[in-house]
Amino acid sequence: MLSRLQQNLTPKQATAVGLLAVAFWSSVIGLIRTVSLHMGAVGGAAMMYSMAAVLIFIIFGRPNLSRFSKSYLFWASLFFVGCELCLSLSVGYARNARQTVEVGMVNYLWPTFTIIGAVLFNRQPAKWWIALGFILSFAGIAVVLGGEGGFSVSGMIANIRTNPTSYIMALSDALFWAAYCTLTARVKAQGNAVGFFFLLVSCILWAKYFSDGTGSLNFDTASLLYTTAAASCLGLGYAVWNIGISRGNMTVLAGASYFIPIFSACISSFLLKTPLPVEFWQGAAMVCLGSSVCWLATRTAERKRY
C-alpha cells in the first residue's frame, strides 16, 4: 500500500515527505549517545538498527530487490552501510558529551557534500560561488573543533588528536551519505531499499558485538525507551528521506537540511546536559550558512537556466 502511495507522489509531495527527515534527524545524535551510554557503543547501535529495520519492514513491507540493478544495490549498500557504521560508532566512541556534539557537527558537513556531489556527478547547475559555501562550512568546523578559543588550526588539530577515530569516522560518514544520496538521485531508484540496508547494518554490528565479546546488554526501562526512540528517528527519518531523494527535489532537501546542525546541537545539549560555548554556536552557524550558500548557488543557476 505504501509502496503504491510512494509511486503516486508528485515531486512536490515527495519533497515535502522528505523534509520530515529534518525533524527526525535533529534528535539522532543525542539519542545515539544516550543509548551507547546505557547499552554500549556497538551493542546499543546493533539494537537500534535492528529495531529500525523491523519498523521499516512493518511500514513499507519487504523491499522488492529485483527492481534495483545489481550495480546500484552493491554501491548503495556500500555507501549506506559505511555511513551508518561510521555515524553510530563515531558517536558511541566519543569520550564525553562535548565531543559527542562536536562529532555530530562534523557529520553535518553532509548537506554541503551532497550539493557538491549533485554538481559534480549529476550535472546540477551551480554558480561559481558555491566554492565559498564549501569553504565556509569547513571554516565553521574549524571554529567548532578549535574549542573556546574559536578558529584555531592548532587547537583543532590538538582536539582531533585526542580521539582521531571518532572525528575521522564522522567525516567519513558525511562523505558516505553524500555519495549515497548522489547515487540514488542519479539512477532515479524505483522503490525503497532502506529496510534491506538497515538489515545489513544490524547484521554487521551484531557480528562485531559477538566477536568483541563485550558482555551482556543492559535491558532496563530507560535503555529500552531511548533505544526505541533512537530507532524510530533513524527508521522513519531514512524512510521519508529516501522517498524525497528518489522522487523529489534533492537540491531543496539538501538546502533545507542546513537547519539540522543547530536543532541537533540544541537537542544534544539538552539530552546530554552539556553547555556549549558561544564559539561553538558561531561555528555551527557557519556550517549552516555554508551549506545554504551552496544551496543558493544551485538554485540561482537553476532559475537562470530556465
PLM feature spans:
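Glycine-/small-residue-enriched transmembrane alpha-helix faces in small-molecule transporters
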Residues: 1-43, 82, 139-142, 152-186, ...
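Membrane-interface helix termini and inter-helical loops of multi-pass transporters
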Residues: 30-38, 91-96, 145-162, 209-227, ...
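Specific transmembrane alpha-helical segments of multi-pass solute transporters/efflux pumps
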Residues: 24-31, 63-101, 143, 228, ...
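Hydrophobic transmembrane alpha-helices of multi-pass small-molecule transport proteins
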Residues: 51, 56, 78-80, 126-149, ...
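Hydrophobic/aromatic residues within transmembrane alpha-helices
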Residues: 35, 44, 90, 120-122, ...
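Hydrophobic alpha-helical transmembrane segments of multi-pass integral membrane proteins
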Residues: 13-17, 42-59, 70, 74-75, ...
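Specific alpha-helical transmembrane segments that line the substrate/conduction pathway
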Residues: 43-54, 92-122, 250-269
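Hydrophobic/small/kink-forming positions within alpha-helical transmembrane segments
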Residues: 23-26, 30, 57, 77, ...
